[in-house]
């Protein structure tokens, strides 16, 4: 199961959904804009 918008995540084990990226500072899944 992947993590969606603003779900807590681990930047070293990024389980965010397609199109999202774990934000290292906030430890949340956010839209990947790049």
UniProtKB/Swiss-Prot annotation:
The entry's note on the tissues where this protein occurs is: Expressed by the venom gland.
Q: Does the keyword Disulfide bond apply?
A: yes
Record key words, sorted: Disulfide bond, Ion channel impairing toxin, Knottin, Neurotoxin, Potassium channel impairing toxin, Secreted, Toxin, Voltage-gated sodium channel impairing toxin
Q: Name one GO molecular function term.
A: ion channel inhibitor activity
Q: Which cysteines are joined by disulfide bonds?
A: 2-17, 9-22, 16-29
- Please give the superkingdom of this protein's source: Eukaryota
The record's listing under Pfam families reads:
Toxin_12
Where is this chain's protein located in or outside the cell?
Secreted
GO cellular component terms given for this protein? extracellular region
Keyword Secreted attributed: yes
Could you share any additional remarks the record makes about this protein? Answer: Shows only a very weak inhibition on human Nav1.5/SCN5A. The primary structure of the mature peptide is identical to that of VSTX3 from Grammostola rosea (AC P0C2P5).
The text the record gives for the protein's domains is:
The presence of a 'disulfide through disulfide knot' structurally defines this protein as a knottin.
- Please report which protein family the annotation says this sequence is part of: Belongs to the neurotoxin 10 (Hwtx-1) family. 61 (VSTX3) subfamily.
Describe the function of this protein: Potent voltage-gated sodium channel blocker (IC(50)=190 nM and 210 nM on human and rat Nav1.3/SCN3A respectively, 430 nM on human Nav1.7/SCN9A, 770 nM and 290 nM on human and rat Nav1.8/SCN10A respectively). Binds the voltage-sensor domain of the potassium channel KvAP (from Aeropyrum pernix) and weakly inhibits this channel.
Name assigned to this protein: Voltage sensor toxin 3
- The record lists the organism as Paraphysa scrofa
Source lineage: Eukaryota, Metazoa, Ecdysozoa, Arthropoda, Chelicerata
């Amino acid at each position: 199961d992947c993590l969606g918008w603003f779900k807590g995540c681990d930047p070293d084990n990024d389980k965010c959904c397609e199109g999202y990226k774990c934000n290292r500072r906030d430890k949340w899944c956010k839209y990947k804009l790049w």
